[in-house]
Every structure is written in C-alpha cells, then in structure tokens.
Amino acid sequence: MPIGQVVARRLDPPLQRLSRQLSRGLASRAAEGPWVEPWMNRPGYPHDQLVAGVGPSSLAYAPVRYDERLIGLLVIESIDAVDKAATTEALPALVEFADLAGALVGRDLARRANMGRVHDHISNIISRRAFLPVFQPIVELEGNAAVGYEALTRFTDGSNPEAVFAEAAAVGLGLELETAALVAALAAAKTLPESAWLNLNASPELIIAGEPFRTLLGGSRRHLVLEVTEHVVIADYVAFRAAMAALGPDVEFAVDDAGAGFASLRHILELRPAFVKLDRSLVAGLEADDARQAMIVGLRHFARATGCRLIAEGIETDAELAVLRALEVPLGQGYLLGRPVPVGDTRRTVA
C-alpha cells in the first residue's frame, strides 16, 4: 500500500480520488503519531475542494505501521460538529483499529513487496544472462576416464544456485530461468569432447512441456542425460514417461540424489532410469560404515538386474573412492575427481 493511502469509513468517489492525491506532508506528519485537525478549505488545494464536497468538519488520522514502518494512514471524518470534540473522542478507537489493520495486512504487504523485489531480481538475472555454465566430470572409477559431464549453473554475484532457482520458482519465473540456463549450457558444451555425454538438470514441468523442450534440445547432437532430483514431485508418471519417449533414443534419464529420501525409490521404480545417482549422504564416511556399504551393494544389484548404471556423487576422499571401486560402482563424480569448472578448463579437471 503506498504511503498516504486512505482507508475511509465510506467509499465515496470524492474520498477515493482524495486517497490518490494526498500530499507527502501527510506521510511526514504521520511519523509524529495520530492527530485530529479541523477541516480548512484552503484555496489552491485541489484535494481540499474534494473533501469539502463531502462536508466534514474535522478529520482524525492514525498511522498504520508494520515492523516499525509506516505502510498507510487510516482517516475518519466528522460531519456532526463544528469543533473537534467528537472526532477527538474517536481517536483512541481509530488508533486501535489502525494497529489491528497493520498486524493483519502488514505481513502480506511485506511479502508482496519482497516477492516483487525477487521477481525483478530474477528477471534482471535472466535478461543480463548473469550466470555461467560450469561442467563437472563423470568418471569411470576403473581407469579414471571422464565419460560425461554434468552441467551446473553459477551466478555471477556468487548467490547459492539452489536458492536462486527456488526463488525463481516462487515468483513464477522458474521455467524461464531454467530454460535460459539450459540454453547457455548447451551452447558452451559444444566444445566438450564429442564422445562425452552431457547431464542436464531439468524439472518435470519443463520436460512435460513437450514441443518447446524438444525444440530446446533439438540443436544438440550430443548424447544427453536429463537429471531429475528426488526432491521434486512428479505428479503424472505416465505423462512424464511419454514426454521422455518423445525425446528419442539419444536422450536418457537419471534419478538424482538417490538415498536422500523416499521419493527417489518411486522415481526409480516408475521411470526405470538409465542412471541412478547415489546421494552424497550414502558416500560420506562410506569406508567406516557397513550399513552404507550394504545399501550400495543392494542398489548395485538392483542396477544390474534392471539395466541401469550407478553414479556415486560427492566423492571427496581417497578412502571413499577405494571402497566404491571395491563395491564395483562403475561411475563417480565429486571434488576428488574434478570440480565444476568453465568449459575451457574441463581438460584439466580429472585427477
């Protein structure tokens, strides 16, 4: 609500027009607290002429605040007396009502204002392309050769990528930001080794979009793997499978973050992905945890029985790598094997 907005007892057209014409002086005076004043029809003040048509004798004003900020002004009028007595008597009730109004509407106004700022910020990121695609190698654990790369997004202001994408989704710009990031990643990936596949993070909403998404991927001749995290909800598995099938044989599917929660198990069973990516929570401290090792052995058995391949994520130590090799996990990814870097530095990332 703009400073100076009037909430009146009755929504007469003159008062509605007045609410749009109140001077900045009211907002300045509101900082001092509630007040009552007789109405004076001052020549040369258009809003005075408007209120004079209503016939007030005095007005009472109460600031509406939220979080110690002025967000509006509540006004009542008196037409029953020539002096200020009647209006002055009503002032405590007006102040109480203004406090209640601030508590009721202030939080929503603050939320809307913040959402507006976030929307503008995300729009600015998209229009300025204020992000950079980086690529992390996916490595064969036996032989240490990079066979694929996952495209990730880094923002030029250093913002956390997950937070930015979540904010974009919250203000209705999730698909726009996601599409812009994918376009940048596909363009940059053209200089990667031709034999390497490319993993792209894509939301179910974008994949199910159909033709727009197929057009987006259509310019790439590289083998693509679409990753969907276990944290997202797939509302319609039938529609998702149909959308994936329409992308053709050169586009496969991976379930990301397997082991981080229950949703990944249903994703795996319903979608039969080509790859299952083991979450860092299964890999961390693996060398000293029999339960984690048993879980990975079970997933390895499932992968072999269903024809998918495991990728262990978040490999950070030699001990973790050694156990994963011993457990015959075929593929891995993590800082030990290569950090996410711009495309020009990918040849130097694999240990």
Language-model features, listed with the residues they occupy:
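Catalytic core of bacterial c-di-GMP phosphodiesterases, primarily the EAL and HD-GYP domains
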Residues: G174-A242, G314
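Sensory-domain boundary capping and coupling elements
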Residues: V64-I79
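A short, aliphatic-rich beta-strand micro-motif
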Residues: S57-R65, V134-F135
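Regulatory loop-to-helix N-cap segments in sensory/regulatory domains
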Residues: E77-L94, G158-S159, G285
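Active-site core of bacterial EAL-family cyclic-dinucleotide phosphodiesterase domains
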Residues: M115-E167, Q333, G338-P342
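Regulatory sensory and allosteric helical modules in signal-transduction proteins
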Residues: I3-A52
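Signal-transmission/dimerization alpha-helices at domain junctions
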Residues: D67, A93-R112, E167-V171
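EAL-family c-di-GMP phosphodiesterase catalytic domain
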Residues: Q5, P204, H223, E227-A235, ...
